[in-house]
């Protein structure tokens, strides 16, 4: 460990020496810019923008732009960034993480790289953990940016789409991580480009970067659609499907496991559901229910594909013949089977779109972050986000007294000691911040302090605005604040009058967190900006971390030292080392777990990029989507011909090709087997595509203008893509949950997931092609399509 620390320190020293040279260039402009009038300083912004347009890079502009922001901060905010803050700003501009201790002015540090990068006009996002901090920083720092001629937007959950669009179109946008993620997902669900709110993701500076990119890395952002109210539709579709006659109303293709309505079946469906045209784009949802009802009734076999047990439809694994507990068919097929068998139809909320923070933030062209604690996770930041963690020196030397851990045999004896310490420090008026890992612990400790008549405040994360006030007052003389898991990040604890004289803020940890980083955050609340302060952790052999790791060795150590008294205390570097080694093991496990999630999510990321890219192409198109639709139809035709016209001509199934053409492309009486006889597979494909071209031309004539045709094409493609994509997300989720079992068969679950996921994606693309073909070719176009 000592060697690793040494390497870190030496590597940082080299980096800081390199950054010092750039920072010195910034400081060299101080006198010159200090003499400029306000108007001349403000005129620098349009000058920089012009120079950027003419080819100067942001790196070229850095010294002057940083000097401008620095002088502006002095005039507008009354704050003048120190040399170390310039260093931090350069690290952020370079797309790395600036590790700056609490109280070193991270918010002011960010103003310089934010201003510099906003010059490009491509947008800068300042990302915070909650809306309170977002609004606070945007309001305070916004004064500086506005003065320098930059626009500032605040994004929030309550904002309307118009307000969000305005916020994202500003030069600088303040937002929470969650809201950026949900806006990204919603933008990829809209039908019209004017409904989108975001611009391409350009540059983000994440405040408390470890909290967002590590602690919340595994949290998926999910937009769910309500599928309630669909039970009735499954039942109606099922009742209709049961009235049909094989080969008269529908045709089954066992090879491809598909079932399609024939013209008579379509006519019956239109009569049954009271429709003019079953394949009108307004009936996409009904078509879905009908398709699933047909599959459930005429493809899926009871006691082969599924069994009914205790009023539930359970899937049978086709390989093992075993029941697959907890698994459900996706795409609504399971509900269709439940309707078929008259058992209770289980509603499901449907995932419409999802993404993890890991993959959201990796989409930015440039990403940077700042925090007081990131060095312990350096490897993860480098490997997953390609960001280095650079420790920025403090402006004043740190004099906080970090004491070795105190270890007690029992929880009871530990808390007795904690309460005793609080009493002693409270008597001399020294303010205290007491960190607990769990809410129950903070409530227990609060109860103990009530018994001792010690006034105190308990902090939980329910009210961010109030929380910030409580944390800000935690440095006043005599204040006692109990905080769970570092509530109040982002707010400085400033020392009140007379507090330095009694030793500054005392931080007391009531147990070690499983992450060293969280412990370091707690310690870091004391001793800001060269203030005095103290930190002390109290542990017991009954703490969670000690029970899980390393406790045996420590017990043996205590026995060797003949420690039998419950109130005995041990203060030893060996104890601290043991605890840190336990923490490192947990951190390693957590990192492996996050990396594992990312490897699985990367499969979805690649697929998401393809689908969202296609959606973007469709939404942004302004002339015609014929170049998109025609290849989809061509691929569908080719797949069908290849499936049914393989090998010798005597084995070809021309009836199946005709059935396909009638179901998905042309009027039923307009094509027969005679039209295809004597043709090679390539000639059949050419013949069918020729028919497609004619139908396309007819549709174009039916509409007033190209704009109407484009609108029709967009609606068809987007409805089909979105319907299949949401089903695919569900299917991939189910695959992900079940794939671990393959590990028992000596198969690599990740490789299996990648392979099956790719296959499912290919199948989905084929389904999208087919449904787009069917909807586009079979729809009757009404005049004047309404949005």
Swiss-Prot record:
Keywords: ATP-binding, Cell membrane, Cytoplasm, Membrane, Nucleotide-binding, Protein transport, Translocase, Translocation, Transport. GO terms for molecular function: ATP binding; protein-exporting ATPase activity. Its EC number is 7.4.2.8. Its main location: membrane. ATP binds at residues 85, 103-107, 492. One of its GO terms (biological process) is protein targeting. Pfam families: P-loop_SecA (PF21090), SecA_DEAD (PF07517), SecA_PP_bind (PF01043), SecA_SW (PF07516). GO terms for cellular component: cell envelope Sec protein transport complex; cytosol; plasma membrane. InterPro entries: Helicase_ATP-bd, Helicase_C-like, P-loop_NTPase, SecA, SecA_CS, SecA_DEAD, SecA_motor_DEAD, SecA_preprotein_X-link_dom. It is found in: Cell membrane; Cytoplasm. Belongs to the SecA family. This is Protein translocase subunit SecA.
